[in-house]
């Protein structure tokens, strides 16, 4: 019998033979190739010209500020990770072999806990390293992009900016694939426990980087806009604004380090979910279960090769002025190669036997068309990624109706701007979740009625969404690099003539690519969470020791049909879990947005105090950039703890306090409201931002008009929506799912011991309440600190 503890790390029955070991070897080779290509791109970017002395001076100030922030952030995160690592260790369980594999203990509780804790730490390191590398290169590629534009070369500027992003992309896919490959090669039948630890580490660190970086960047941005644009009437990135360097630093620590880590954990969690579910899924349809384990690795390796080709395919043709066209060509190359490679893998490696099925959805003949089903699930993911991208582009692009409608509403003041942007964001969220629902329905249909195999296809759909992650990360990092390049040129007095045209064009395209990649991350978070939710149900069955009429452990679809594994919302306690889960995204968003608002208030006070005597505007005094950087750094690090505790402790409170069924409903609530809120916040913020840019292009009175001032207020409201709260909901959803998997065995073990349950949930609740109370303190306390 196949062990059912797939998600928690129970023994999985399979044997890696020559073909599977070859796939592991090729997967590792593809990962190493990605890292080598990343290093090659580093060398290529750094050898480019840096421009004038003034440009170098400004770039160095941004580098110093970004590195100082990241160093302090990693130190703070390190202290938080120590107790979390202890939780990972103590929630581990011994792993026993089933009788068919000889019985006995495969790993003791101490061994399992030690190995999983090490995997957790390595996941943290890999995610942090991805963010660090992405940010480090971005703070060096920005000035080189500006220098290339200064030479009048659109082609060179695009290549430098995109290949700077390509460094982060290659290290994201390389480290993610290498980590999973090494864990499977070392632990084999017990690897799923270590993969959960590795994925949890990556997700938790991504949450830290997303929240901390988002607070820093948007506090500086909001403060700079409110005083600079609205009150002083000076343009964005004007060197007279004391917050402008902090604003540019924030682009790197938030949009580069944060997003790179975010996409790393999305990439890793979808891979982990596919690997975890693969063994049981292939066993359920009578195929070699080892194929289900290595197929996701092979598919990821194909995606890595395709991403490398896609990054190098991004080249502007002579006379081409729209950078989005070559970027889309690169993405198309990567997508096409992924489709071709996955088709070959599914049909030639797994096979596609036809047992005479009456139709594609015929559940009675599950051996039919397996290869086609696997290929179809990956393609559905690729299509979903494109649909969500186009949907995001429609609701946030300056050439489409929603943004033009928001821009038109500026004629009647900031209130109507906020109302129209809110409506647009809410509407976009509905369409996004409907698209995801259709994709989930399609993959379930492809499963032919076998629930376990269908859920494996759902995980593969998530993998398909992020198959070209190397290019996706490159696109995202391209945004802040081009934004910084324009800022450096502005502060150095170089943003004019052909240089200005090139950099403004790249910046506009960068805003589009940033918005699009947020759609990728949000959609993949939901797909991955659904797959992990399936693992949660499997773990319940295994921990409860559910058996069929013959006395054998439940397998396949029977696991999901058993009464004990049902999440029944008609049960009041279960429904309470659903309600709490639905509220978490709201609380998390409130914490993040409040932190930005509070910190921005302090930034505004600092900038106003420097402008007060008129010396900066008169040119008799230089602005002091340091205090604003210090304010944003201190505040963002101070605000890290509460969102992290909310993500880790809320599942503990619900699981131990109410029960495992309530925790399952809690996860369902988190997935639903988290997805809706993430899309709403990201798209509303993006629409407000681009409505402002649309007006700055000369519409509705242009810069300096009343309409422009109203648009700036809308953009200011949207900043923490799209760059702090919205994106950080992605790792929040996955962290909570992974925490639930980690603690589920302990919840079931102590479900009849009220003393232990209430002590654990009570202490966790007390810590959580104290943290939330601390986060609600007034601004004055922060100023005093």
Which residue ranges define each predicted feature?
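Hydrophobic packing and interface segments
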Residues: 2-785
């Amino acid at each position: 019998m196949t062990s059912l503890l797939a998600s928690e790390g129970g023994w999985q029955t399979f044997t890696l033979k020559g073909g599977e070991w070859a796939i592991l070897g090729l997967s590792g080779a593809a990962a190493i190739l990605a890292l080598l290509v990343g290093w090659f791109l580093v060398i290529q970017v750094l050898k480019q010209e840096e421009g004038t002395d003034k440009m170098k001076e400004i770039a160095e100030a941004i580098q110093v500020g970004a590195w100082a922030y990241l160093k302090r952030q990693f130190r703070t995160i390190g202290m938080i990770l120590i107790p979390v690592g202890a939780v990972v260790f103590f929630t581990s369980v011994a792993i026993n072999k089933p009788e068919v594999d000889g019985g006995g203990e495969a790993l003791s509780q101490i061994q399992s806990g030690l190995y999983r804790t090490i995997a957790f730490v390595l996941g943290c390191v890999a995610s942090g390293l991805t963010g660090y590398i992405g940010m480090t290169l971005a703070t060096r590629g920005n000035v080189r992009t500006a220098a290339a534009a200064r030479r009048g070369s659109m082609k060179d500027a695009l290549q430098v900016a995109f290949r700077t992003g390509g460094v982060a992309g290659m290290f994201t896919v390389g480290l993610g694939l290498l980590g999973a490959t090494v864990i499977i090669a070392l632990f084999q039948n017990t690897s799923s426990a270590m993969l959960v630890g590795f994925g949890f580490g990556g997700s938790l660190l991504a949450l830290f980087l997303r929240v901390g970086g988002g607070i820093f960047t948007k506090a500086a941005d909001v403060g700079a806009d409110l005083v600079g644009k609205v009150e002083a009437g000076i343009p964005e990135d004007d060197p007279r604004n004391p917050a402008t360097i902090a604003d540019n630093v924030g682009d790197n620590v938030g949009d580069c380090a944060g997003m790179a880590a975010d996409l790393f954990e999305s990439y890793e969690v979808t891979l982990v979910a596919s690997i975890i579910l693969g063994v049981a899924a292939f066993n359920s349809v009578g195929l070699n279960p080892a194929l289900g384990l290595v197929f996701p690795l092979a598919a990821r390796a194909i995606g890595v090769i395709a991403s490398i080709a896609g990054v190098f395919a991004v080249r502007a043709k002579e006379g081409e002025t729209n950078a989005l066209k070559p970027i889309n060509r690169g993405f198309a190359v990567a997508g096409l190669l992924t489709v071709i490679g996955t088709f070959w893998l599914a049909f030639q490696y797994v096979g596609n036997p036809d047992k005479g099925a009456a139709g594609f959805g015929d559940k009675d003949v599950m051996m039919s068309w397996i290869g086609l089903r696997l290929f179809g699930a990956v393609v559905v993911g690729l299509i979903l990624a494109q649909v969500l991208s186009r949907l995001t582009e429609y609701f946030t692009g300056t050439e489409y109706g929603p943004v033009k409608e928001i821009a038109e509403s500026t004629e009647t003041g900031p209130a109507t701007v906020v109302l129209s942007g809110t409506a647009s964001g809410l509407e976009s969220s509905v369409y996004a979740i409907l698209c995801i629902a259709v994709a989930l329905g399609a993959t379930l249909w492809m499963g032919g009625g076998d629930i376990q195999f269908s859920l494996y296809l759902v995980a593969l759909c998530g993998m398909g969404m992020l198959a070209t992650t190397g290019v996706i990360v490159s696109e995202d990092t391209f945004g802040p690099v081009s934004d910084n390049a324009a800022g450096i040129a502005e502060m150095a007095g170089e943003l004019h003539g052909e240089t200005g045209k090139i950099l403004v064009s790249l910046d506009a395209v960068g805003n589009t690519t940033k918005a699009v990649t947020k759609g990728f991350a949000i959609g993949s978070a939901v797909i991955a969470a659904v797959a992990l939710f399936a693992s949660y149900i499997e773990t319940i069955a295994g921990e409860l020791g559910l058996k069929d009429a013959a006395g054998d452990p439940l397998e396949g679809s029977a696991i999901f049909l058993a009464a004990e594994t049902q999440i029944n919302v008609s049960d009041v306690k279960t429904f309470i879990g659903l309600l709490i889960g639905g509220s978490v995204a709201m609380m998390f968003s409130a914490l993040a947005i409040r932190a930005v608002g509070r910190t921005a208030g302090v930034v505004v006070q600092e900038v106003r105090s420097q402008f007060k005597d008129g010396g900066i505007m008169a040119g008799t005094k230089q602005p002091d950039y340091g205090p604003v950087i210090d304010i944003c750094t201190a505040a963002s690090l101070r605000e890290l703890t509460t969102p992290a505790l909310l993500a880790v402790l809320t599942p503990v409170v619900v699981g131990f306090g109410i029960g495992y069924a309530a925790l399952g409903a809690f996860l369902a609530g988190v997935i639903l409201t988290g997805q809706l809120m993430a899309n709403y916040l990201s798209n509303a913020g993006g629409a407000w931002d681009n409505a402002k840019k649309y007006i700055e292009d000369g519409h509705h009175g242009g810069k300096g008009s009343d309409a422009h001032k109203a648009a700036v207020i809308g953009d200011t409201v949207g900043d923490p929506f799209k760059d702090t709260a919205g994106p950080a909901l992605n790792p929040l959803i996955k962290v909570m799912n992974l925490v639930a998997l980690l603690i589920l065995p302990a919840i079931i073990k102590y479900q009849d011991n009220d003393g232990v349950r209430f002590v654990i949930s009570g202490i966790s609740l007390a810590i959580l309440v104290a943290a939330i109370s601390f986060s609600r303190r007034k601004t004055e306390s922060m100023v005093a600190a």
